Amino acid sequence: MSEQRYNRYEKARILGARALQVSYGAPVLIDTDQTEPILVAAEEYDAGALPFTVRRESN
């Protein structure tokens, strides 16, 4: 399975959703020194550790 590429809107939605989860106490999926939820989410995204998928509708 190839890695899915996300556009800027999908990436923003994924990072925002994950940052909200982290801010509510969800476990962090990678080792990081960051404390800000959005920065934690960004590092997880860069590491490919986020369990999110995007379903695109075909016309």
Swiss-Prot record:
Catalytic activity: RNA(n) + a ribonucleoside 5'-triphosphate = RNA(n+1) + diphosphate
Superkingdom of origin: Archaea
Keywords of this entry: Cytoplasm, DNA-directed RNA polymerase, Nucleotidyltransferase, Transcription, Transferase
GO cellular component: cytoplasm; DNA-directed RNA polymerase complex
EC primary class: transferase
Coiled coil region boundaries: none
Pfam family, one: RNA_pol_Rpb6
Entry's Gene Ontology molecular function annotations: DNA binding; DNA-directed RNA polymerase activity
Residue ranges of the TM segments: none
Example GO biological process: tRNA transcription by RNA polymerase III
InterPro entries, A to Z: Pol_omega/Rpo6/RPB6, RPB6/omega-like_sf, Rpo6/Rpb6
EC number(s) given by UniProt: 2.7.7.6
Subunit structure: Part of the RNA polymerase complex.
Main function: DNA-dependent RNA polymerase (RNAP) catalyzes the transcription of DNA into RNA using the four ribonucleoside triphosphates as substrates.
Family of this protein: Belongs to the archaeal Rpo6/eukaryotic RPB6 RNA polymerase subunit family.
PANTHER family associated with the record: DNA-DIRECTED RNA POLYMERASE SUBUNIT K, DNA-DIRECTED RNA POLYMERASES I, II, AND III SUBUNIT RPABC2
Protein name: DNA-directed RNA polymerase subunit Rpo6
Native source species: Halorubrum lacusprofundi (strain ATCC 49239 / DSM 5036 / JCM 8891 / ACAM 34)
Upper taxonomic lineage: Archaea, Methanobacteriati, Methanobacteriota, Stenosarchaea group, Halobacteria
Gene: rpo6
